A protein has these predicted regions:
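Glycoside hydrolase catalytic-domain context in secreted enzymes
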Residues: 1-242
């Protein structure tokens, strides 16, 4: 249950980003989101809420149409198919009022013990890059961000794929990422493609990149201000993971 009533969260605490991961009938979610949006837009400044979600089309409890996660899509090596599935996801998410998509995962899965590999496009960075572009074009639109776009938050910069011993950095024991053979740039290939495709947001990760910085990417001025904003020229939204 929420810590505070929805009316208080919207009108008094001015919450304007809400993540809703589904689990019930989409028609109920649409009514709920519309009710919250009506509260927000009826406030003094009328600033609307941005509703976000993780991918739902590989989660049978979501009430959405079902197809394989990113790894299954990568097995087809068909960028056109990935683009079309993303376009369908756009339609389904907009139907319930969701405009922020917490994906795709641009992590290159070079550590086979990492448990989140099914959510990635695999270990081949050039293939990942090709499919990332298609995914973003399907969700956001090939012509850039517009009225019918669902914004993609590509993750987890600069890449969770090489986590040490496969320990995920969402947990206290998943502290480090390693780049044997100097492969840091290899893991950036899909992220560069995502930015070229116009990704509206980038999500950082919580692992410390060995040999790159002494703090996690989410706290790294070197990686966010220096690399992502500076060298790579990203001007969109940067968010942390949760």
């Amino acid at each position: 249950a929420p810590l505070h009533p929805p009316r208080e969260m919207v009108l008094e605490r001015h919450i304007r980003h809400v993540n809703n991961f589904g689990g019930g009938p989409p028609v109920i979610e649409a009514r709920w989101n519309n009710a919250l949006q009506e509260l927000a837009e009826g406030s003094r400044l009328g600033i609307p809420i941005v509703f976000g979600t993780d991918p739902r089309n590989a989660n049978p409890r979501s009430g959405f149409a079902q197809w394989p996660p990113q790894l299954g899509q990568a097995a087809t090596r068909d960028a056109g198919l990935v683009r079309e599935l993303a376009r369908l996801a756009n339609e389904q998410q907009r139907a319930v009022g969701v405009r922020f998509h917490i994906a795709p995962m641009a992590d290159v899965a070079t550590e086979p013990r990492w448990p989140r590999i099914p959510g990635t496009f695999g270990e081949d960075a050039p293939l990942c890059a090709e499919l990332i572009r298609a995914y973003i074009e399907g969700l956001q639109g090939a012509g850039g961000i517009g009225p019918e776009s669902v914004i993609c938050s590509v993750k987890h910069f600069p890449g969770d794929g090489p986590v040490v011993d496969g320990f995920d950095p969402h947990n206290a024991y998943g502290t480090y990422q390693a780049y044997p053979g100097g492969q840091f740039e290899y893991h950036l290939i899909p992220f560069r493609a995502a930015l070229e495709a116009g990704a509206g947001a980038v999500m950082t990760d919580y692992a410390i990149p060995l040999g790159i910085d002494a703090v996690a990417a989410a706290f790294s001025e070197k990686l966010i201000a220096g690399l992502l904003r500076g060298e790579m020229g990203f001007q969109g939204v940067v968010v942390t993971d949760w």
